[in-house]
């Protein structure tokens, strides 16, 4: 295991890894007191390299690492990649390409929903992971050998896991299924945190469309404040306070003092004026610019039994193909399919349609039936 703290060592390591067919990647980060995660360690492993990069080392330039992430000749292998990629998007404007996420691949290969790394280490690599350093403050220096070994284990076993899963995907001809999922993880929009959409994260009641307009603006205000000041959203203003502001709609800074969820003394802060400006923007928002909040569409009468049949079909198809149900469809998808033959849901697109969606539509049209044979539930072709 090599600990990299200098630009020269990082360039040399990335040059070596650039000739490998794949490199396994993981990170350790902290975001307890910040909006943006603080990148504390980067773990990398190639066929003959085991490296830990210290991003907190003085004057270390991570450009060679980000160039490696974009090197199309090297597959970047992660387990549950989303948070790692979010960091790379923010820090280095780099999205790994090509990308392989072993958690997604494992769900396609029959290991259940959101399978954990430790499970794959045990089942595919015949190893075990020491969890005793899991709650380490990774921003502290120096780190102990035990902590570094714990971090390194997140990528060393990953090499074997990747090789096993890649072979299974080739054998089952499902590599393109995983590729479709990787396209979502590689889409920059997956990681966009736009202030104008922040209201969707806030669970709040509001009075009519005008209250919603105020919520849109004050949630955007909080998002900008959190990003610019690098503070957790809750440290700027809690959801309860945003909800109360959207309900009560204060008109002056002093009105904020009468809201229970707004921190005492906030009206005297430098942020109070900008918050009230956000309230005013909400009050002035044109009717046509206020978002339309649509609740779940009521199911057509009598459609419940069809939804239940689709649940059974989903279970049958996922067990038959050894794929996690969660990856194929959820209840909301099934309800939409039951109500609309060409519903805009993932289960009717790409490999999901191939595995489940087409049969779901055939079941709905009466071309496929579900029956019982002995102790087994079976699918029966009809003559319609």
From Swiss-Prot:
Species: Parvibaculum lavamentivorans (strain DS-1 / DSM 13023 / NCIMB 13966)
GO molecular function: 3'-5' exonuclease activity; nucleic acid binding; nucleotide binding; ribonuclease D activity
Pfam families: DNA_pol_A_exo1 (PF01612), HRDC (PF00570)
InterPro entries per UniProt: 3'-5'_exonuclease_dom, HRDC-like_sf, HRDC_dom, HRDC_dom_sf, RNase_D, RNase_D-like, RNaseH-like_sf, RNaseH_sf
Function: Exonuclease involved in the 3' processing of various precursor tRNAs. Initiates hydrolysis at the 3'-terminus of an RNA molecule and releases 5'-mononucleotides.
Example GO BP: tRNA 3'-end processing
Family classification: Belongs to the RNase D family.
Catalytic reaction annotation: Exonucleolytic cleavage that removes extra residues from the 3'-terminus of tRNA to produce 5'-mononucleotides
Keyword Cytoplasm listed: yes
Subcellular location: Cytoplasm
Gene3D superfamilies: HRDC domain, Ribonuclease H-like superfamily/Ribonuclease H
The protein, known as: Ribonuclease D
PANTHER family for this protein: RIBONUCLEASE D
Domain 3'-5' exonuclease residue range list: 1-170
Chain ranges of the HRDC domain: 208-289
Keywords attached to this entry: Cytoplasm, Exonuclease, Hydrolase, Nuclease, tRNA processing
Gene Ontology CC annotations of this record: cytoplasm
Subcellular location, principal: cytoplasm
Known EC number: 3.1.13.5
Enzyme class: hydrolase
Cofactor(s) demanded: a divalent metal cation
């Amino acid at each position: 295991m090599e600990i990299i703290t200098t630009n020269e060592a990082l360039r040399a390591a990335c040059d070596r890894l650039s000739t490998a067919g794949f490199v396994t990647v993981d990170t350790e980060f902290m975001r307890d007191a910040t909006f943006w995660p603080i990148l504390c360690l980067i773990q990398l492993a190639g066929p003959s390299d085991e490296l830990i990069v210290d991003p907190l080392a003085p004057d270390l330039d991570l450009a060679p690492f980000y160039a490696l992430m974009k090197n199309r000749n090297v597959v970047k292998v992660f387990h549950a990649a989303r948070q790692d990629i979010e960091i790379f998007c923010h820090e280095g404007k780099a999205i790994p390409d090509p990308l392989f996420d072993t958690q997604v691949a494992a769900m396609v290969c029959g290991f259940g929903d959101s399978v954990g790394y430790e499970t794959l280490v045990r089942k595919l690599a015949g190893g075990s992971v020491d969890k005793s350093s899991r709650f380490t403050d990774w921003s502290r220096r120096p780190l102990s050998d035990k902590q570094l070994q714990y971090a390194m284990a997140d990528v060393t076993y990953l090499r074997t896991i990747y090789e096993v899963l890649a072979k299974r995907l080739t054998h089952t001809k499902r590599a393109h299924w995983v590729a479709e999922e990787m396209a979502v993880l590689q889409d920059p929009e997956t990681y966009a945190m736009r202030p104008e959409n922040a209201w969707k994260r806030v669970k709040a009641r509001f009075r009519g469309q005008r209250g919603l307009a105020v919520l849109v603006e004050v949630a955007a205000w909080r998002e900008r404040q959190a990003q610019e000041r690098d503070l957790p959203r809750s440290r700027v203003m809690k959801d309860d306070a945003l909800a109360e502001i959207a309900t009560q709609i204060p008109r002056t800074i002093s009105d904020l003092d009468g809201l229970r969820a707004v921190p005492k003394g906030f009206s005297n802060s430098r942020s109070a004026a900008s918050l009230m400006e956000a309230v005013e923007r909400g009050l002035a928002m044109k009717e046509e610019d206020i978002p339309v909040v649509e609740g779940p569409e009521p199911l057509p009468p009598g459609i419940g039994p069809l939804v239940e049949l689709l649940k059974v079909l989903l279970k049958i198809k996922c067990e038959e193909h050894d794929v996690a149900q969660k990856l194929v469809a959820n209840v909301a998808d099934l309800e939409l399919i039951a109500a609309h033959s060409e519903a805009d849901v993932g289960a009717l697109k790409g490999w999901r349609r191939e595995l489940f969606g087409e049969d779901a539509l055939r079941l709905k049209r009466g071309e496929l039936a579900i029956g019982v044979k002995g102790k087994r539930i079976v699918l029966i072709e009809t003559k319609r």
